Curated annotation (Swiss-Prot):
The lineage of its organism: Eukaryota, Metazoa, Chordata, Craniata, Vertebrata. This is Mitochondrial amidoxime reducing component 2. It comes from Rattus norvegicus. InterPro entries: MoCF_Sase_C, MOCOS_middle, Pyrv_Knase-like_insert_dom_sf. GO terms for molecular function: molybdenum ion binding; molybdopterin cofactor binding; nitrate reductase activity; nitrite reductase activity; oxidoreductase activity, acting on other nitrogenous compounds as donors; pyridoxal phosphate binding. GO terms for cellular component: mitochondrial outer membrane; mitochondrion; peroxisome. Binds 1 Mo-molybdopterin (Mo-MPT) cofactor per subunit.
Length: 338
């Protein structure tokens, strides 16, 4: 290498050494710069999203047994599979026929009269004309695992024993029933199976809820519905997990992502309503008409999504849990926007 080359190298701050040596040094330097840039980019805080308060949590319900009466709670954990209060999770128990097919208040309306009390390691069940029964939350691992069927999809459930099976059978008086419990080690029902044609939906799993981990309705939406009904209905007809006050009627239809407490939620879809909404939660009598017929008169979906909702009216919203945490009654509800 000539003197002119050595001078040029000196200007660049590279020693006059063999070409292979300084090229290696240069490469290492460039690599260090690149890694530093990547590290800086990763270390930069993400652009903070704006929070717009849209309401306040006025009520929280957990429904331990599918279709049975909900338990009102002041505070709850929010897991990726739904609400949890202590050791009790939302819709982790389900009544089934002996062949494993689910039974809900659609088939047995009097299920809505089964009251559940949370008692440390037990659930206490009460129903009209029945002696209370205590159900342990933790079941023996030796209990039989049933292959169950829920809205056409397979899911497992651990048998809760003969005593509670006889209790439900005696109460409903139509056929033999079993009670099963979901275990987090079991495989839940996934988005891909719940909505095989809706590939855009985020991925999540549920145990025995109909569609999603969280069901939310605003108080104002119920008020709006009741202005159209001869016989007023209460929120328990619709079995939400979270009720929101302080917003306009059906404003929840527009909420894509929410922050409540330290829980982040993402909209899945609107809640299509069925005949279950016509079961009176105080009497266990099914009407099969109202409030469903009135909802159909003004809450049908846009024609562009008719393949998803068919002729079901929409009332309430389903959400998935994007960040687990806890929430409580009185928490502000924030809409997260970019």
């Amino acid at each position: 290498m000539g003197s002119s080359s050595s001078t040029a190298l000196a200007r660049l701050g590279l020693p006059g050494q063999p070409r292979s040596t300084w090229l290696g040094v240069a490469a290492l330097g460039l690599a260090a710069v690149a890694l530093g840039t990547v590290a800086w980019r990763r270390a930069r805080p993400r652009r903070r999203r704006q929070l717009q308060q849209v309401g306040t949590v006025s009520k929280v319900w957990i429904y331990p047994i599918k279709s049975c009466k909900g338990v009102s709670v002041c505070e709850t954990e929010c897991t990726d599979m739904g609400l949890r209060c202590g050791k009790v999770r939302d819709r982790f128990w389900m009544v089934v026929k002996e062949d494993g097919h689910m039974i809900t208040a659609r088939q047995e309306p009097r299920l809505v009269l089964v009251t559940i009390t949370l008692e440390n390691n037990y659930l206490m069940l009460e129903a009209p004309g029945m002696e209370p029964i205590v159900l342990p939350i933790k079941l023996p691992s030796s209990n039989k695992i049933h292959d169950c069927r829920l809205f056409g999809l397979d899911i497992k459930g651990r048998d809760c024993g003969d005593e509670v099976a006889r209790w439900f059978t005696s109460y409903l008086k139509t056929q033999a029933y079993r009670l099963v419990q979901f275990d987090t080690k079991m495989k839940g029902r996934t988005t891909k199976k719940l909505y095989p044609s809706e590939s855009y939906l985020q991925n999540y799993e549920v145990a025995y809820p109909d569609c999603s981990p969280i069901h939310l309705i605003s108080e104002a939406s119920l008020v709006d519905l009741n202005t159209r009904l001869q016989k007023k209905v209460k929120m328990e007809y619709f079995r939400p997990n979270i009720v929101v006050s302080g917003c306009e009627a059906f404003e929840e239809d527009t909420w894509d992502e929410l922050l409540i407490g330290d829980v982040e939620m993402k909209r899945v879809l609107s809640c299509p309503r069925c005949v279950l909404t016509t079961v009176d939660p105080d009497t266990g009598i099914i009407d099969r008409k109202e409030p469903l017929e009135t909802l159909k008169s003004y809450r049908l979906c846009d024609p562009s999504v008719k393949s998803l909702y068919q002729s079901s009216p929409l009332f309430g919203m389903y959400f998935s849990v994007e960040k687990i945490g806890s929430l409580r009654v009185g928490d502000p509800v924030y809409r997260m926007v970019d």
